[in-house]
């Protein structure tokens, strides 16, 4: 099973873009508080960028604002690329369901 689920706060406005194939997309920056404190008792945050596609991208870019809370379910994807004869692997997060938590 390939799935993730987060609840976090939007930190920047997403910009709606269109691919050469006509698909709508945007990147949604979200700050998520960790569910455990560090050694000083402080709950730190993780900043993530979530890929949003098609109708979800249009809705998110038109409806959200900085500071809004969202719940996101999705999948993790990987991309391989080669540089200087070394193979690298990048991971990204793709939204499949977005709930606006206002």
Language-model region placement:
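Single-stranded nucleic acid-binding surfaces, predominantly the OB-fold ssDNA-binding core
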Residues: 1-102
